[in-house]
Amino acid sequence: MSYKRLINCCVLTFFVLTAVAQSGSNSPYTRYGYGQLSDQSFGNSKAMGGIAYGLRNGLQVNAANPASYSAVDSLTFLFDAGMTLQNANFKENGIKTNAKNSTLDYIAMQFRLFEGLGMSAGFLPYSTVGYNMSKSKQIGTDPYGNNIQALESYYGDGGLQQVFVGLGYNVFKNLSVGANISYLYG
């Protein structure tokens, strides 16, 4: 029985490592600006349609509502991670392309510092960039009348990542305040 668990853990680890290595986007629109902005919500709020600001539960990490950090119990340490699998189909001039992407959505932890004071820290992707396009165009003719073609290639991969730390404090019953500090890099 223990060998079966070990094999399952190795297989799952392989999938997670593969997921982190992917760009997460195949959209030509990510060429402009910051790229495609990532969904900043965690699994519990995604399951309820993206709602996050009104959730305050001591058993869930909610970076969108830092005041909710104060609800964590003194004996609780929360660790949360999530990933997304995405399938996209593109069609241009009769050419069909299928792209499968997997991304690490977030890693976060939450714990209680003192009575009424909770803390959370984690990592969230802010945006993703992933495109690989090329086009050929005529740039002139040679002395024999043949067209001269040039191939323009555009490639981009990466995005912005966000590391955050936040505190939430329960001022009095039914009133909590909180704030996050974030650092963007990429």
Predicted region positions:
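Subset of outer-membrane beta-barrel
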Residues: 22-186
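Bacterial Sec-dependent N-terminal signal peptides
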Residues: 1-26
